[in-house]
Amino acid sequence: MQYPLPIARLIDNYMKLPGIGEKTATRLAFYTMDMPEQDVEDFSKSLMQVKENLHSCSICGNITESDPCEICRDSNRDRSTIMVVEQPKDVMAFEEMGEYNGLYHVLHGVLSPMDGVGPEEINIKSLITRLQKQDEVKEVILALNSSPEGEATAMYLAKLIKPAGLKVTRLAAGLAVGSDIEYANSITLKRAVQGRTDL
């Protein structure tokens, strides 16, 4: 038996989300159908608002409602340090930790030649331009996930940045190989930042 078209479409759309298979998508679709109409309306509005009201900061690439973002505008941040991360969710993880007070730069990915992702496909050019313009920057912390792609991206960035005379550091060991920063607890992140090593 085939599902009615609206349910089938909803299942297909849920399956576009990472980690959602057909069974989970079907369960979510039927749950959505049983939700009060106001909740469904609020849910759909919040989805649209994310797309309509959020964009990338023109300086750091983090998600923001205003440009530049709140972190880039904050005059109390330590402007001598820029932490390079893969995704906006990594910024959130370090901000929740509450120990880092520098600036960020979000790459929106990592180098992955097998997937057709080269330096032009991620936010590297804007990082180099930013470092050339901002004289107060003394250290660049490469806080990339400890995956093979993250490691390769860190080495590539270090080769680009070090000739400019800037200190380039990497998070200390402590994050399991292949683990994502967003899932690390605050204590692990704090130790990784405090114990960072030169590249």
From Swiss-Prot:
Transmembrane segments: none
ZnF (C4-type) intervals: 57-72
Domain Toprim, residue spans: 80-176
Residues making up the signal peptide according to the UniProt record: none
Keywords: DNA damage, DNA recombination, DNA repair, Metal-binding, Zinc, Zinc-finger
InterPro entries: DNA_Rcmb_RecR, Rcmb_RecR, Rcmb_RecR_Znf, TOPRIM_dom, TOPRIM_RecR
Keyword Nucleotide-binding: no
MF terms in GO: DNA binding; zinc ion binding
GO biological process: DNA recombination; DNA repair
Keyword Lyase recorded: no
Family: Belongs to the RecR family.
Function, in words: May play a role in DNA repair. It seems to be involved in an RecBC-independent recombinational process of DNA repair. It may act with RecF and RecO.
Protein name, entry field: Recombination protein RecR
UniProt gene name: recR
